[in-house]
Structure formats: structure tokens, C-alpha cells
């Protein structure tokens, strides 16, 4: 496969835990996860069920070529894109037992790492400006098979970074 797949496999091997039979038990008890991760803390709630429905609509049963990349976006701050992204990624990794990489592309206000009780000094923006290699930036979350790439350090030109050729190459690498 590609470099991205190899990097994800390496991150998973470093902290791999055998898949658990129940969703709740696949998250370590000592994790400092945000309580808004309803897909983890309220696995039988109506909200979590809506994330399951969304997941099923994206990954329809019998689909020959399921999507490799899903983007969650909004026009304004505070509309819930991080809430949707972290819960959808959690449901995918927990219930489909599929590897998932959640990339925080909000370079103005990166927040994904905080949802998982993690910190990252560098991330996507640092990769895009050439100050870090992607394999050094992937972070394993407390949720089995879910890794994240944080937004990184705040840069003055987030629109240009997201539209850069390096970002396009990263997206192509993620698809492979």
C-alpha cells in the first residue's frame, strides 16, 4: 500500500489492544475523553443512533467501493462540525472495526485533540509548511483503531495551506 497506510499501521501497532466484544469496553477506563463523545459514552442514546444511521448511509451494505474520505464542513464556527466528525469517526472505528484517521483541517481553531484528552504541538499545518513528516504526527486515540492528525500550530495563511499542492497530495495518499 502507500506511506500513509504504513504510518497508520505503525501507530496502531504501538498501542494496539485486541478488539473488545462490546463497544464500551474498547475504550480504556482511564481515558480523558470529552463527554460530548456520545458515540462512546451514550452508546444507546438517540443521538448515537443518528450517528449510526449517518454511518450506514455513507457505508451502505453491499457497496462495492465505499468512500475512503469523508469531509465534515460548515460555513461558520459553532455549527457542530467537530462534534459530528469526532462522533462519526468514533462510530466507524468502534462498530465497523475499521481503521479511521480523523484529520483536523480547522487550522484557525484546531480542537480534535482536546476531544480525546490529548495534546499535540504539531500537526497538519506543520506538515503542509514542511516542518514535520506525516508519520511523526499521527496520534493514537484511546479508541481502538482511531488515530488523529491534529490541526497543528496556528499559521497566518490557513486557506492557502488547505488549497496547496501538498494538501492535494496528502488527500490522494489518504485515498490509497
Residue ranges and their predicted role:
Residues 1-176:
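P-loop NTP-binding module
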Amino acid at each position: 500500500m502507500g506511506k500513509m497506510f504504513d504510518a497508520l499501521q505503525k501507530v496502531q501497532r504501538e498501542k494496539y489492544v485486541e478488539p473488545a466484544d462490546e463497544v464500551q469496553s474498547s475504550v480504556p477506563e482511564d481515558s480523558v475523553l470529552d463527554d460530548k463523545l456520545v458515540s462512546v459514552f451514550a452508546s444507546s442514546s438517540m443521538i448515537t443512533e443518528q450517528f449510526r444511521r449517518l454511518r450506514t448511509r455513507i457505508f451502505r451494505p453491499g457497496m462495492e467501493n465505499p468512500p475512503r474520505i469523508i469531509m465534515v464542513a460548515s460555513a461558520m464556527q459553532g455549527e457542530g462540525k467537530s462534534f459530528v466528525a469526532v462522533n462519526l469517526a468514533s462510530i466507524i472505528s468502534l462498530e465497523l472495526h475499521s481503521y479511521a484517521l480523523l484529520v483536523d483541517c480547522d487550522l484557525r481553531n484546531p480542537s480534535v485533540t482536546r476531544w480525546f484528552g490529548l495534546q499535540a504541538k504539531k500537526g497538519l499545518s506543520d506538515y503542509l509548511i514542511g516542518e514535520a513528516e506525516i508519520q511523526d504526527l499521527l496520534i493514537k486515540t484511546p479508541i481502538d483503531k482511531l488515530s488523529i492528525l491534529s490541526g497543528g500550530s496556528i499559521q497566518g495563511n490557513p486557506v492557502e495551506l488547505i488549497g496547496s499542492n501538498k494538501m492535494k497530495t496528502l488527500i490522494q495518499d489518504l485515498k490509497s
